[in-house]
Amino acid sequence: MRILRGSPALSEFRVNKLLELCRELSLPVTGIYAEFAHFADVTAELDASEVQKLEKLLTYGPTIEEHEPEGLLLLTTPRPGTISPWSSKSTDIAHNCGLDKIARLERGTAFYIERSEELSELQLIELKAILHDRMMEVVFTDFESASALFAVSEPAPYTEVDLLTGGRKALEDANVTLGLALAEDEIDYLLESFTEKLERNPTDIELMMFAQANSEHCRHKIFNADWTIDGVKQEKSLFKMIKNTFEVTPDNVLSAYKDNAAVMTGSEVGRFFPDPETRQYNYHQEKTHILMKVETHNHPTAISPWPGASTGSGGEIRDEGATGIGGKPKAGLVAFSVSNLKIPNFVQPWETDFGKPSRIVTALDIMLEGPLGGAAFNNEFGRPNLLGYFRTYEEKVNSHAGEEVRGYHKPIMLAGGLGNIRDEHVQKKEIPVGASLIVLGGPAMNIGLGGGAASSMDSGSSSEDLDFASVQRENPEMERRCQEVIDRCWQLGDANPIAFIHDVGAGGISNALPELVDDGERGGIFNLRDVPNDEPGMSPLEIWCNESQERYVMAVADKDMATFDAICKRERAPYAVVGKATEERELKLEDSHFDNTPIDMPMDILLGKTPKMHRDAKTLKANNPAIDRSGIEMNEAVDRVLRLPTVAEKTFLITIGDRSVTGLVARDQMVGPWQVPVANCAVTAASYDSYHGEAMSLGERTPVALLDFGASARLAVGEAITNIAATNIGDIKHIKLSANWMSPAGHPGEDAGLYEAVKAVGEELCPALGLTIPVGKDSMSMKTKWEENGEQKEVTSPLSLVITAFARVEDVRKTITPQLRTPDNLEGLGDTSLVLIDLGNGKNRLGATALAQVYKQLGDKPADVDNAAQLKGFYEGVQALVANDQVVAYHDKGDGGLFVTLAEMAFAGHCGVNANIEALGEDTLAALFNEELGAVIQVRNDDLDAVLSTLAANGLEACSHVIGSVEASDELVIKSGESVVIERNRTELRTIWAETTHKMQGLRDNPACADQEHEAKKDNSDPGLNVKLSFDVNEDIAAPFINTGAKPKMAILREQGVNSHVEMAAAFDRAGFEATDIHMSDILTGQAVLEEYNGLVACGGFSYGDVLGAGEGWAKSVLFNDSTRDQFENFFKREDTFSLGVCNGCQMLSNLRDLIPGAEYWPRFVRNESERFEARFSLVEVQKSDSVFFNGMEGSRMPIAVSHGEGRVEVRDNDHLNAIENSGTVALRYVDNHGNPTQQYPNNPNGSPNAITGLTTTDGRVTIMMPHPERVFRTVANSWSPEGWGENGAWMRMFQNARKNIG
């Protein structure tokens, strides 16, 4: 083992946060210094040149002054016996750089602890706990101990459970020790199956496989159970009531209840992808259907939030990719419900500390870490995250089960999304006998063991070690490679080699492989030692049942194996043939190492007629008093509700997630010139050549279930509809729903409540509306139990139904946002009015509202959907208005009620509101804070009569009220008649609304950046995003050259982990280039030669997952490979070529500066000042330079998509910065909304000196930039754009310039 020192690992503010934690724990720590330590496992001694190459490879990241370490050494490393994602990616880079003697690289962090006195044993344990994550790391006290990272253990054998002599007791003991979560009747079933049918003892691996495959998590036993309620046998199971929605309204559903995701009818559009033979990008006109799936990952997120949420998103993405015979994930959502945050020094009046068990983390930690995990996976995979919700609830209430603490100690972590699939690929094919059964993706590791069974238990029912063992680890860059393989397969059309595919999720391959062959009506014979395995010491049970992520299983016919193998090699996606499909429905697993057969059983024992569950439930009704108003004052109520996290601004959850990748995002969360996160729904374009698209929205009103189960379920459906109504869908039958049910099954009253809620939507509301629920998920163990000081405690979740609505969109340009408009920012607007559509019909019920929660109350009667026909009329009326362009702004009424709706619209519009609520009743508190369904729309007064007439025609006349007007002011004034009810300054309210996001950012990110962003929100003079162009955006200067028919050749270059290549190809294609897909593996293997191309673009993403520095690993694979280096150097020297590097490609090309003429002053790009991935829509100004891309654009100011974690320009010193400025190579700078270059965050999202974000060479042929012009080349893909732009956005001009430059 060779040990190499790395760069410092922690910035000053990260060190300060650790020291603060030490002070809180009263540890005598006076200083901390941390640096990376690298460990190389070599197969032979490295020569001097190889050592030099390795040292250069491991020099990356920000240049921080080195520190000669002193103090106590605590070395954190990945757990011995595991291989971290960092290790696998950095080892890949080393091999691609020719360092073949390196078997493996690994990285640790060396902490040097200075202390005022020696640490006691207990203090040392506490210190280690804050320095490492016990889920995946260990702590050593010397470097030599790290050799354990490369130790190889001997394989462990399987064990038998002796039922033949030990009987039922032996199985009961195994149930506990292995954490199988078997029910009593399942124990009986297994006992009978093995002792009477098979007449042998089971192996531990067979029992674990059975437990995973038949867990509540995988088999949904409660939803398939027979029910008796209050002594009356019920006719239908829960699942049958859900399926009733499909029986009543099967319209537009192509696949339901049988695959990894549901499929609905999409649009016919031109899908843009490379031709499988020529690799040239083209449009392919075809039916492009819509995938939809929403998962939960609650249990792992409670134990370890980052990996729990990250693998939750990763698993849902795999579900979409594994639909039919290959789907394409497109846009995601992430949502959370947790208990009260109790932010330090910001604890709110309604937040009581009810305690928690030690095995789970706090709600605050979940929300500091979990969203980062979910965002990081989506970011690195390359899927925009466009939707979410965030609810906090934890209160002692008197509901149907009496007084108890209800809340989300077991959180909800929701991960979902939509994708696309070809018409001919919706249904899976037949598995041929003898087909190869394949595992595609990463290796087996001893992680995530028993996750399916563990998540099926109430939190606290299993041992703590089993809880920790059941959490997985993530490697999104590996999943991206696997998806590229799936993409290449479906792009082959009828020649798609995939016959059958499933993702690997709960239960690992022990669930996925049996499911694969069973669904394909086959059996399978497998060899355990063919499963790719990074931990040779694992037992057969651990190899077969672990939940290592980023894996798919599939069947490929022998005739298609050569095609499949070539695709995998090109994409560098590992795969293994682990078995063959058999005619006999038997499952056999052979182990060549021990020469035995750990599994040999008929499929019908594993997945056959296991005992059916029966639920006997009793109805309990809540009887709670109305809200006590005596302590509620209007202005204080306003402040409290705006601070409730469910209502408050969510920016800290949004800007961490890429919202522009694909270039197909038509509506993200951020709205208008001030980028306020209040969008009603998410919208994507179906293609680059049309305005058809897809939309998704969320609906949930879970606290209502504490008063009325059915109402909570109906409101969830209703809210999803009032949200998605903001876009142009048409017939309601184009909307399909996912229903995610979370319940504390078995808790008093909850089972009957669950049945009532499912019946309310499945048998009643959805059929009445014409809505179908073709997909969903259930999580039936939403309770946390623990013992504290000898007292039994529990926190029980409310029944929680989360509805996600998905829809085909006719025209994405017609999507309406909540941004109020005034004549000064919308030409020809004229006078406007605000209209409230109140589907509560004046009932104004306050039960289980945000208002009730912030006063620690529940109330009696909640909002409800009293009239399904009226809700349908609302949808149809709003759709008519949207289609006719008669709505200026739209916002649904939800958490916080009418007051919050009006406030959020004013925030988005940076304006005032003058409203009068006299028509809503005398009870102004109830009128403003009830959460009945509805919406507020802004309409032109010229259209007002027509709008009211349309609403009346849809049965909404009695509930539609003109309540006020929009004012070009900073005041929110609400009156009732002549009495002023609320008169508040908008900026002041906006600041209060932002406090939660500010506090959370300050705890999680660089607090200086958090403070700057919060201060900026107080600036009422901020003009918002604006545009100043030196050219006509609607002129196509490339058209004359395109008309000649000549198409210059453009190399669209990607490396493993790059994810922005398709939109880049689309931009160059539109400008008249012949865009060709080139993978770095094509260049390294000689399949592609750069000299054939006129232009080269290095695309954005996460090459090698950004290990060894963003873009640096990619660059070093060029620099350290002589033939590849020569090819790039020769290309850059050719005077008839041009090159562009964007984001990751910018970072990569900046590291090739020695090969690029005129780039000698280029800087490096390192970690953002905020130390956080930044996804922003930032204003930049084009500088005077010779860049071929920016010819004629000098002085133009326009917003652009920014998405990076390492975009800060790093210079050696001031002389270097001056040399850059004096060379005339600065091409782009960040500017504030007044047009001035800025260092202020977030206008300068990464802290780059002199606001530099784009550079060119002295001759202008090579340009690099961190922002993403390719994602916003269409107007519709801009989060905000001014009126008057046509199809092309302003950034299309730089691609047209490139074409014009060639002539």
From Swiss-Prot:
Enzymatic reactions: N(2)-formyl-N(1)-(5-phospho-beta-D-ribosyl)glycinamide + L-glutamine + ATP + H2O = 2-formamido-N(1)-(5-O-phospho-beta-D-ribosyl)acetamidine + L-glutamate + ADP + phosphate + H(+)
Active site, per annotation: 1143 (nucleophile), 1268, 1270
Gene Ontology MF annotations: ATP binding; metal ion binding; phosphoribosylformylglycinamidine synthase activity
Region (Disordered): 1003-1023
Basic and acidic residues bias: start-end ranges: 1011-1021
Domain of life: Bacteria
GO cellular component: cytoplasm
EC class (word): ligase
Enzyme nomenclature, EC number: 6.3.5.3
Pathway involvement of the protein, from the record: Purine metabolism; IMP biosynthesis via de novo pathway; 5-amino-1-(5-phospho-D-ribosyl)imidazole from N(2)-formyl-N(1)-(5-phospho-D-ribosyl)glycinamide: step 1/2
Binding site residues for ATP: 308-319, 679
Localization of this protein: Cytoplasm
Keywords: ATP-binding, Cytoplasm, Glutamine amidotransferase, Ligase, Magnesium, Metal-binding, Nucleotide-binding, Purine biosynthesis
InterPro entries listed in its UniProt record: Class_I_gatase-like, FGAR-AT_N, FGAR-AT_PurM_N-like, PurL_large, PurL_linker, PurM-like_C_dom, PurM-like_C_sf, PurM-like_N_sf
One record GO biological process: 'de novo' IMP biosynthetic process
Residue ranges annotated for the Glutamine amidotransferase type-1 domain, each copy included: 1050-1303
Residue positions binding Mg(2+): 719, 723, 892
Primary role: Phosphoribosylformylglycinamidine synthase involved in the purines biosynthetic pathway. Catalyzes the ATP-dependent conversion of formylglycinamide ribonucleotide (FGAR) and glutamine to yield formylglycinamidine ribonucleotide (FGAM) and glutamate.
Protein family per UniProt: In the N-terminal section; belongs to the FGAMS family.
Subunit description: Monomer.
Name assigned to this protein: Phosphoribosylformylglycinamidine synthase
Species, as recorded: Aliivibrio fischeri (strain ATCC 700601 / ES114) (Vibrio fischeri)
